[in-house]
Amino acid sequence: MENNTNPISGQGKCPFSGGAAKQSAGAGTRNSNWWPNQLKLNILRQYSSLSNPMGEEFNYAAAFKSLDLITLKKDISDLMTNSQDWWPADYGHYGPFFIRMAWHSAGTYRVADGRGGAGFGMQRFAPLNSWPDNVNLDKARLLLWPIKQKYGKKISWADLMILAGNCALESMGFKTFGFAGGREDVWEPAEDIYWGSEGKWLDDQRYSGDRELENPLAAVQMGLIYVNPEGPNGNPDPLASARDIRETFARMAMNDEETVALVAGGHTFGKTHGAADPNQYVSAEPAAASIEEQGLGWKNTFGSGSGEHTISSGLEGAWTTTPAKWSHNYLENLFGFEWELTKSPAGAHQWKPKNGAGAGTVPDAHNSSKSHAPTMLTADLALRADPIYEKISRRFLENPAEFEEAFARAWFKLTHRDMGPVARYLGSDVPKEVLIWQDPIPAVNHQLIDDNDITILKAKILDAGFSVSEMVSTAWASASTFRGSDKRGGANGARICLAPQKDWKVNNPIQLSKVLDALKEIQVTFNNAQSIGKQVSIADLIVLTGCVGIEKAAKNIKVPFTPGRTDALQEQTDVASFAVLEPEADGFRNYMKTQYTVSAEEMLIDKAQLLTLTAPELTVLIGGLRVLDVNFNQSKNGLFTNRSGELTNDFFVNLLDFGTTWKASSESQDIFEGRNRKTGELKWTGTRVDLIFGSNSELRALAEVYGCTDSQEKFVKDFVKAWDKVMNLDRFDLV
């Protein structure tokens, strides 16, 4: 139970003070109530060891590898047809139910920031466990609990939910493309994901203008996974629905063909549930349910509350004549009947065949003496109304084998899109084929450089005449594309040498090209001189160059470096897919692509969270990168030092100097001038990103640590550690 209101009317006395006990620790008016616009640093301390019961020594990959996957899959398959009295299976098969669970686990993914998806098992927690679109999926997870209980730590909930969906498809006669484990559970709700600003379920303030959807959102309404199946805001207009479908699925990384395959394939199975009006019969969602419900929600008082009386979406009916078996009947029905608008018993808009056609062809889910006509939703008819979708749908109808392959591949992409590179995939069912959306990186096929080689290469890099700024900037630009959300980006693959990254404005393409050309010369010269198959990749050289820059700036420190990166090819790089990794802002380089409604400091925290940084790591990196002159276009904003290119704590010392007074120098209050408090002489200029480390109380507390007279050594040590972390975020081979 998450709605922890005490139902007891009588008030006891506090055993310590004797007063009435009204609230416990953590209750009361919070900082966020007083100052709702305060910077939210809590997203930088998610999923810490304090909330993880497994302990830091636990290795999920090792645990998964000890799993008997074949036996587990058999147990899941046996469950499919083992109908439980407390939640009877439609058509005697839980397969469609588990497909919906898996789909809704993975379907929250959005490509813009890589957040959402199945990767952490978030469907277990609010808000997802209580979204209107996830109604009754609490029962699906409860059905799986005996299996999770049996296999324990060897299988995460995140993996189990997706595997159950795969097993469901296979149990009903469909051949899947494969399955990979490797999704490690977290133990608390995600605070970093922006689901929208609406305060009411199914509201859609996320739209503006000509139905322009707010970034990074993908779903059309608060609490939905994709689109409204009845049509935009319940308007049963198939063509308007197609527009929503296209944008939503594209924002979830699906093209038109994949979209049609997923809709047609997914709706081949199961049915919708709307036996009666949910407003009259269905009670609170899990997060608001009473404590005795033990995590379950949506209690239904209509009839038996389950089986033929189930109320979920409010829509009612099945699409095909064999809802628990793979077939091509969905497309056959979609084009084989003409459809007219009707309403479900719950009052929801849906479609039935005209003139009573199709009557008696669809079995009842629970009563063998009943039968029905097929049902379509507005979102289904969009596949006929939209000319592009219709062409694809008819092609699939005429070419069943092509449809099956398209659905298998699209389902695999849907359920694995947020897992990152194949190096993270676990298990015997991992497909051998490497797919372009997995951002493939060649395997290491050469002997790696050793310490002596590294010393030689460092000397060559220094001899090339790069400035500290050029060396550090290039390495940062390469590595900082990483997103901990969907594990994309990073230095491995050296895609900074390829389109589109090499041309991004934030990377200063002219300067970048100069550095990369020189590094390629060093690479060719070194590799040609080797006689035993030893090679160095550009990816490794770029990171090593950053290490050289920091060592030059810090004088007496060795920056860790681990070779083993390889170089991707342009043909292994989907330009459109990688375009979403281009930073809208990078506060570490004091870069803003344009003016946004979101503040620069909020975008900094967002970027830091995607880089999996803590608040101390964020702070020390900002301080170090500023004095190393890594700013976009060599801007002097935030360069609070007279020793540019030296790794000092000057940024913090000078920011915290009360002898400086700050005033906005632009109407938008994004640039500030720091002047001598007594003379008015201009000393520094800074951005909101710079000044937030003196303004925000938490960040100021951290800045003070590094601004003390005895902190220089700690500052350098902490900076190098945080730097090394960023350089290796995508080195899954080292985990």
Swiss-Prot record:
Cross-link (Tryptophyl-tyrosyl-methioninium (Tyr-Met) (with W-103)): 226-252
Site label Transition state stabilizer, positions: 100
Top-rank lineage group of the source organism: Bacteria
Residues holding heme b: 267
Position of the Tryptophyl-tyrosyl-methioninium (Trp-Tyr) (with M-252) cross-link: 103-226
Keyword Metal-binding recorded: yes
GO MF term set: catalase activity; heme binding; metal ion binding
PROSITE patterns membership: PEROXIDASE_1, PEROXIDASE_2, PEROXIDASE_4
Cellular component, GO annotation: cytosol
Listed Low complexity bias regions: 17-28
Cofactor(s) named in the record: heme b
EC number: 1.11.1.21
Chain residue ranges for the region called Disordered: 1-31, 352-371
PTM section of the record: Formation of the three residue Trp-Tyr-Met cross-link is important for the catalase, but not the peroxidase activity of the enzyme.
Keyword terms of this UniProt record: Heme, Hydrogen peroxide, Iron, Metal-binding, Oxidoreductase, Peroxidase
GO biological process, alphabetically ordered: cellular response to hydrogen peroxide; hydrogen peroxide catabolic process
Summary of subunit composition and partner proteins: Homodimer or homotetramer.
Family according to the record: Belongs to the peroxidase family. Peroxidase/catalase subfamily.
Descriptive protein name: Catalase-peroxidase
